[in-house]
Amino acid sequence: MNRTILHSDCNCFYASVELLHHPELRGKPVAVGGDPEARHGIVLTADYTAKRYGVKTGMALWQAKQVCPDITFLPPRMDLYLRFSRMAQEIYADYTDKREPYGIDESWLDVTDSATLKGDGFHIAQEISSRMKKELGITVSVGVSFNKIFAKLGSDYKKPDAITTMYEDEFQRKAWCLPVSDLLYVGNATNKKLYSMGIRTIGDLAKSDETLLVRKLGKMGSILWAFANGYDESPVKLENTSCLLYTSPSPRDLSTSR
């Protein structure tokens, strides 16, 4: 049976939540992270205005100030973000009980069995997007696909406030031209190895010799080759969404990073 998997990503999550509480900062460059008064720590999230100046997640606060002198830093309030994350999960729960959080601001949803009552995946994604704006005041980017890997790629494809399909009859056209580093689980080290093999795009990876990939990357080579070709049967794992894990740097990391 063909599956319908969504991946929902809350856009600039921490900054978006903060702007709900600081409407006077809308349209101005804003970043959340570290200790703004001491200028210690790193950027956890920047809003899209700050990103246009070159501010990036993981950048030291002093570096962000250099590239964007008018930026406003706000200290992180994890309890607040967790509350919004749980409210997002409550919205998702209206469409499926098969939900797998990916960090605090992203989730996979298996809506295969929801079509009869809720409509197809694209319609469900539209409803979720609309409700997130209306009920929580934030936007999401949603990928709609037949597996988790391409659903995630779909949510990354266009931001903010977008819905992108990656169906079986279109993923080659949409995904294969993207940089291979856009594929989930291709980190910096793996990307460098693939680059040394002449693999630049997801399409290059899909058309590569699987045996050679295994020789260079071990078991992960075969896994990534399968992902690039649309072979991903991994299930959406049923997680306890009432106790979401915070997977970003700890408060201590934020205060000691330079």
Name each model-derived stretch:
Residues 182, 190-248, 252:
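DNA-contacting surface of Y-family translesion DNA polymerases
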Residues 1-104, 108, 115, 228:
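Residues that scaffold, gate, or flank divalent-cation-dependent active/transport sites
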Residues 120-124, 128-177:
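Long, highly charged, low-complexity intrinsically disordered interaction regions
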Residues 109-125:
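Catalytic palm subdomain of template-directed nucleic-acid polymerases
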Residues 17-19, 42-45, 150-158, 218, ...:
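Short acidic, glycine/serine/threonine-rich loops at helix termini
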Residues 102-106, 145-148, 241:
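Short Gly/Ser/Thr- and Asp/Glu-enriched loop/turn motifs at secondary-structure junctions
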